[in-house]
């Protein structure tokens, strides 16, 4: 049984009350101010029926109110489901219902879609902020093995799975990151990634654990981010490939304060890493996923040039193996990446079958392919064999194929990622049609059922799809 910790935000507010916690534009909160705002919001949420042990779903963009709401839920002892704002209403509703969320905390324009209270009562964050503020007693301690957050990630079967991330996962992720990247007194971490993704949300946990300032952007804009790095003296920023590419195109030389651009969301092409090297942009590659509560391997800064293209070595207290057919691979031999350690999720919510398939003697099978070099550095070859990573968003072909196959005129469907200069990869669909159907109709059909980034950017009509002897679709031959 893991030990308990004092309430993190309350403890941080007592230790460094006047240190800046969050900056978003002109809106700034110190840790003591953040604690007071979170406690007031906790009281308001309690008046809306939330209590210790409940689950709340958050459907919010990057805004100060979301930061406050996250901490308010933790003060109440409420676990959080982070909903992707890009999902369709049907996708969001499934996640709300499956997680048994009691309350949906959201904003315009989403509030109108969920007004009916199905499957949870929807409340506008502005209504919460304007509500009366009854007194509330925050929980004094947190149980490290309790689930703090739930994030849904689609599996290769196309069905969403709820990843349960414990307070221990978040704590050891933050500590392991600090042991790898170092922690400096004046560190400021810029986040322009969505807070509903683990790479964005993890910065909020690091903030209270480190006593570090988060500089929050509602969305990514290269010029605004570069201006913010200069004006706010940002030292670390989390990025994905598309963001890094746009930043590199805008600068000739690295801003003086910046010591780390933590790159996640899939491998970056060597050409981009070499461009960043020329411009002295301090790119630190990492490897991780929702199930590992952000990074589980990171390339230490001193190896960033020598091991260009590597995701580095496991973070402290974590382990990584490469396996093939149940046998550990030798250096240079390709196999499945398996991971173990205190940042690995508690499991998938209400999905024992997936848990059984994903874990073997405590090791989590990622489904990703990679290898170690002779020096023990990890190289990731593919983020799961068929996974499409588009602008940092995960797209699972099976999920898109299932929607296409639900169209009455589509007999067979296959989806794969095609290289794209802007997004890295975009989905293309390959179809066998029962009767005539045009691309515009299919696109509209998908838009009603999928997030916009999952909708195929092109539709190719073929006579048959490539399949193996077992009749399994061979997507790499599409």
Swiss-Prot record:
This is 2-succinylbenzoate--CoA ligase. PROSITE patterns: AMP_BINDING (PS00455). Converts 2-succinylbenzoate (OSB) to 2-succinylbenzoyl-CoA (OSB-CoA). Coiled coil: none annotated. It is an enzyme of class 6 (ligase). One of its GO terms (biological process) is menaquinone biosynthetic process. HAMAP family: MenE. Disulfide bonds: none annotated. It catalyses: 2-succinylbenzoate + ATP + CoA = 2-succinylbenzoyl-CoA + AMP + diphosphate. One of its GO terms (molecular function) is o-succinylbenzoate-CoA ligase activity. Its EC number is 6.2.1.26. Keywords: ATP-binding, Ligase, Menaquinone biosynthesis, Nucleotide-binding. The keyword Kinase does not apply. The keyword ATP-binding applies. Pathway: Quinol/quinone metabolism; 1,4-dihydroxy-2-naphthoate biosynthesis; 1,4-dihydroxy-2-naphthoate from chorismate: step 5/7; Quinol/quinone metabolism; menaquinone biosynthesis. The lineage of its organism: Bacteria, Bacillati, Bacillota, Bacilli, Bacillales. Belongs to the ATP-dependent AMP-binding enzyme family. MenE subfamily. Pfam families: AMP-binding (PF00501), AMP-binding_C (PF13193). It comes from the Bacteria.
């Amino acid at each position: 049984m893991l030990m308990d910790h004092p309430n993190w935000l309350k403890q941080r507010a007592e230790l460094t009350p006047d240190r800046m916690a969050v900056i978003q534009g002109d809106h700034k909160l110190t840790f003591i101010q953040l604690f007071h705002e979170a406690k007031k919001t906790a009281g308001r949420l309690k008046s809306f029926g939330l209590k210790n042990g409940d689950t709340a779903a958050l459907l919010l963009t990057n805004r100060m109110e979301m930061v406050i709401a996250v901490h308010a839920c933790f003060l109440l002892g409420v676990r959080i489901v982070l909903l992707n704002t890009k999902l369709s209403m049907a996708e969001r509703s499934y996640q709300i219902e499956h997680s048994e969320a009691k309350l949906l905390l959201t904003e315009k324009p989403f509030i109108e879609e969920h007004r009916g209270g199905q499957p949870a009562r929807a409340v506008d964050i502005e209504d919460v902020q304007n509500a009366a503020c009854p007194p509330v007693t925050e929980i004094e301690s947190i149980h490290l093995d309790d689930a703090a957050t739930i994030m849904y990630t689609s599996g290769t079967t196309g069905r969403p799975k709820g990843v349960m991330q414990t307070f221990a996962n978040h704590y050891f992720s933050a500590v392991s990151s600090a042991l790898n990247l170092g922690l400096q007194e004046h560190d400021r971490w810029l986040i322009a990634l969505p807070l509903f993704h683990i790479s964005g949300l993890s910065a909020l946990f690091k903030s209270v654990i480190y006593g570090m300032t988060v500089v929050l952007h509602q969305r990514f804009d290269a010029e605004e981010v570069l201006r913010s790095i200069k004006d706010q003296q940002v030292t670390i920023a989390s990025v994905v490939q598309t963001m890094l590419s746009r930043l590199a195109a805008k600068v000739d030389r690295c801003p003086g304060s910046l010591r780390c651009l933590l790159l996640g969301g899939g491998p970056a092409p060597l050409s981009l890493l070499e461009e960043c090297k020329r411009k002295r942009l301090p790119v630190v590659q990492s490897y991780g996923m929702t199930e590992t509560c952000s990074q589980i391997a990171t390339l230490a800064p001193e190896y960033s040039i020598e091991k260009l293209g590597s995701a580095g070595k496991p973070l402290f207290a974590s382990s990584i193996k490469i396996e093939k057919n149940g046998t550990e691979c030798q250096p240079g031999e390709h196999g499945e990446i398996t991971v173990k350690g205190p940042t690995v999720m508690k499991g998938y919510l209400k999905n024992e079958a997936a848990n059984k398939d994903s874990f073997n003697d405590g090791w989590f099978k990622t489904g990703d392919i990679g290898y170690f070099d002779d020096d023990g550095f990890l190289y990731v070859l593919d983020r799961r064999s068929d996974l499409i990573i588009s602008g940092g968003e995960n797209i699972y072909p099976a999920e898109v194929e299932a929607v296409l196959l639900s169209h009455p005129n589509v007999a067979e469907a296959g989806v794969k990622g095609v290289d794209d200069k802007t997004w890295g990869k975009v989905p293309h669909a390959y179809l066998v049609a029962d009767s005539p159907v045009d691309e515009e109709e299919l696109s509209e059909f998908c838009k009603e059922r999928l997030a916009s980034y999952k909708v195929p950017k092109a539709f190719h009509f073929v006579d048959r799809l490539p399949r193996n002897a077992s009749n399994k679709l061979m997507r790499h031959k599409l």
